[in-house]
Amino acid sequence: MPLVTTEKILLDAQKNKYAIGAFNVENMEMVMAVVAAAEELKSPVILQTTPSTVKYASLDYFYANAKVAAQKASVPVAIHLDHGNSFELAMQALRVGYTSIMIDGSHESFEDNIKVTKAVVDACAPSKVSVEAELGKVGGKEDDLDGGDGGYTDPLEAKEFVEKTGVGSLAVAIGTAHGVYKGEPKLDLDRLSEIKEVVSIPLVLHGTSGVPDDTVSECVRRGICKVNYATDLRIAFSKGVKEYLAQNPDAIDPKKYCSVGREEVKKYVMSKMHVVGSVNKA
């Protein structure tokens, strides 16, 4: 089927109290793995690319990969720009054909975050492309993204932000972090519930790799509708490739070792689709 926007699938997730996994992809094999997992479990899915991934292979390459994967799939697939760090990059993604765009103004002042988010929302509206924003700051470091120590989302600011921007979904900072955790993260679940009380749009959880599955499931019960995974996909792919090459040190065919990495990613994605509750929701 054609690529879908995230609005429709996230609203269904919100209505039916589950979440959709959004998986950061770095190459063709990861795109194939994520969509294969979604097909097998009859789950809607979101493919994501970060600015650093876009630098590696450009927006149009990843869009083309996602478009072909979606056309071959029998489940809804969206292609999302994760952590778009400028209005210009967001517009490039819009022109290429991305069906969902995040504009990340979380390191700007509250007023400037509203301003840039509103500009992207207004620009995307004629194409009915979904827009995600972030309020508060998810900590940690991943790719070219450095969230520092992070800063929690204030529920009343979240309400004002959504009202003034008209954004379609909101990433909230409740204690998660990008990259690899040094210890078990401690999430402020009560804060999440407070945000959910005053914000009507779907909420997004970033920095989920390494968060215990039962904690993620509790976040979904408290209103999270989109759950982002990135670091653990890289680990899974690299694990498969490394193990194959360790057993076959003379291997020179990328198809052979990359296919093992692809299978590791597929297994990981399937496990997380069960966690977020999206199985059989396509």
Regions found by a protein language model. Give the residues of each.
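Glycine-rich beta-strand-to-loop/alpha-helix junction loops that act as flexible
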Residues: 206-209, 229
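Extended, intrinsically disordered, low-complexity segments
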Residues: 244-282
